[in-house]
Amino acid sequence: YLERRDIPAVVKKEAGAPCSGLYIPDKKTLLFRVSYYKNRINFEVFHALTDGTGAMHFLMELVKNYLQEMHPSAELPELFPDENITGRDMEEDSFSQYYSSDAPRKRESKKPAFQLKGEKLRQEDMSITEVCIPVKEIHARAKAAGVSITVFLTAALIWAIHEEVPQNQVKKPIGLMIPVNLRNYFPSRSMANFFGWIEISCYFQSDTAFEDILKSVKEQFAKELSKDVIEAKLNDLV
């Protein structure tokens, strides 16, 4: 499915819309793009090549090499010091490696969730919303509520979406798909695509409070992130 290309990667100034097409049928191109805007480095990658973990590792190595070029005398540490890892380990198809025909599959029907609507950009372009959050304050709020930062932010986003729901659709649940790094559940060191997701949804009543949403999201995370459920969902992806 994937073939090696001896094509040099060229860094270019950012141009065009984010997440614009990388894969061009019948044309030999690389499935990733590196660009820059002022002091920001962008790395975009085709979803079949890697996931967020692999992309972040690549970007960190890229930045390290850039800093090494700019500051030759600097002694930068190894980012991922693992002498035992091989190229084959990093290219492993972990979905096939950890698929089990004996494990049960997890498929259940769910009520259609509320669909956000809005004005589309021309030519179906995408836009990016950047949000800077003070980590210490968020961590303190999450800790006080007895939840993780991920659970807290998930509940906050569900609550924010609820505020935009029209009255004629308040009976529909509000759902989010949360990515899950499967390397946390299987002993994989692959930098290839190896992630799944969980679906978190909440129903609202007239007296629903944010604390109720936090409690529901926390319980759903605990259930959906159990090893048995993750293994069943992995089999559905293969």
Question: What do these predicted ranges mean?
Answer:
Residues A15, G54, F58, E91, ...:
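Alpha-helical structural motif
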Residues N42-E44, E130, E199:
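Short hydrophobic beta-strand segments that form the core of ligand-binding sensory/regulatory domains
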Residues Y1-R88, I138-K143, S148-K172:
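Non-catalytic N-terminal regions of enzymes
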Residues V34-Y37, E119-Q123, I133-P134, S190-F194:
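Short, flexible turn/loop "capping" segments at secondary-structure junctions
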Residues Y1, R5-F32, H139, H162-V238:
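Acyl-thioester-dependent acyl-group transfer interface
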Residues V131-P134, A145, S206:
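Residue-level signature of the cytosolic catalytic core of signaling kinases
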Residues Y1-V10, L76-I133, I178:
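Short amphipathic alpha-helices and their capping loops
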